[in-house]
Amino acid sequence: MEEEINHTIALYEEKNLALIQKIPTPITPIKLDQSHKQITLAYFDKKSTVDYMGIVQGIPICFDAKECHKDSFPLQNLHAHQMDFMKRFMLQGGISFIILSFSKRGEKYYVPYRELEYFYQRMEEGGKKSFRYDELREAFLVEAKKDLLVHFLEALNQDILCLNNMNKA
């Protein structure tokens, strides 16, 4: 899915819709294959934050790409340090979310941080350790549009409308 996202964000940049960067995971190389100039063994330096950060029409965004093969997403796949980073990002005025691929269904969803926070809190209070496909809002279904394989800007716009309505209430 990350290749599809990378392709989409390259097109967003080409069309001046967004500037989004893939954040590399910090590693320490241990073994190198000099003949092929490849790292063959490495360790993670520290916990990474999210997969992508950028700006869309003046709005800072950060998000992670996740995939699951069943109709439920185990929250253990979303680490506490990632949730903390997304929360702090939102407190600074940004928008945080994940793009979740249900590979068995061939569908992708934009899941806003506030919904992730609800599911995470439910888990911490002794509830389910996952959330189901049918708990997600259909308005946040991410569909391909022409060459935009993971066209999430429409879902982001829906999220912005929801946030604006929440702020007015």
Give residue spans per PLM region:
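Non-catalytic C-terminal interaction segments of nucleic acid-processing enzymes
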Residues: 8, 27-33, 40, 47-50, ...
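Nucleic-acid nuclease catalytic cores
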Residues: 87-117
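Short connector loops at helix/strand junctions that flank enzyme active sites
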Residues: 45-49, 56-60, 91-93
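Mg2+/Mn2+-dependent nuclease catalytic core
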Residues: 66-92
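Short, basic, glycine/proline-bearing loop/turn elements
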Residues: 32-38, 64-72
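Conserved catalytic cores of phosphodiester-cleaving nucleases, focusing on short active-site segments
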Residues: 52-70
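Short acidic (Asp/Glu) patches
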Residues: 39, 45-49, 78-86
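Acidic-basic catalytic patches of nuclease active cores, encompassing PD-(D/E)XK
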Residues: 1-43
